[in-house]
Amino acid sequence: MAGHSQFKNIMHRKGRQDAMKSKLFGKLAREITVAAKLGTPDPAMNPRLRAAVVAARAENMPKDNIERAIKKALGGEGENYAEIRYEGYGPGGVAVIVEALTDNRNRAASDIRSFFTKSGGNLGETGSVSFMFDRVGIIEFDRSVASDDSVLDAAIEAGADDVISGEGGHEVYASPDSFHEVAKNLEAKFGEPRKAALTWKPQNTVAVDDETGEKLVKLMDLLNEHDDVQNVYANFEISDALMAKMGG
């Protein structure tokens, strides 16, 4: 089950600056409200809401903000948001998936298409690039929760598909169908994970040169800064030096 991870999730860049916190909290609150509206407002009984709350806590979102977002769902908010997945190609032919929650489909589509076009890429049809990714659940724990072997044994017992442990922590992968049960079992053993969410994992990654990498990072930032965009995934790798230069 062990393996070398080439999965570098560019979406984490959106939280790297304090100036982005307010916008990030707004996006997290929107997901919490929609998740609570679609299911029960009790995180213990609503796996999607539970994942949204975990994500919010990982970003140090205040408890009052989380509770307020849940109460909005009880008050009828969250009904007008549509979940949309956009797919396209960025500079260098890199595959990009964008997940959005929007109350204005036309605005979101127009803005996102414009971002792709300005970057030298193009927005495609649904399904145009997602076949190059696997839909998986990821549960992340800090390095300190347990040894590599202990996490591996617990993950196998819980029904996980893969485990990657390194200096940055432990990443446990599971199928979408078993994800919530695996996360629940691991949380009972190791405590609340720092992340638990469904994600798009590239089947393969593409190394790009610095010029293309700069264009791609700028595209990722444009997308992540849009109010309607929740998550962005791409199948490229850039050098650590360029990532540092770009502020990643």
Swiss-Prot record:
It holds the Pfam family TACO1_YebC_N. One of its GO terms (cellular component) is cytosol. One of its GO terms (molecular function) is DNA binding. InterPro entries: Integrase-like_N (IPR017856), TACO1_YebC-like_2nd/3rd_dom (IPR048300), TACO1_YebC_N (IPR049083), Transcrip_reg_TACO1-like (IPR002876), Transcrip_reg_TACO1-like_dom3 (IPR026564), YebC-like (IPR029072). GO terms for biological process: regulation of DNA-templated transcription. The keyword Ribosomal protein does not apply. It is found in: Cytoplasm. Belongs to the TACO1 family. This is Probable transcriptional regulatory protein BRADO1143. The lineage of its organism: Bacteria, Pseudomonadati, Pseudomonadota, Alphaproteobacteria, Hyphomicrobiales.
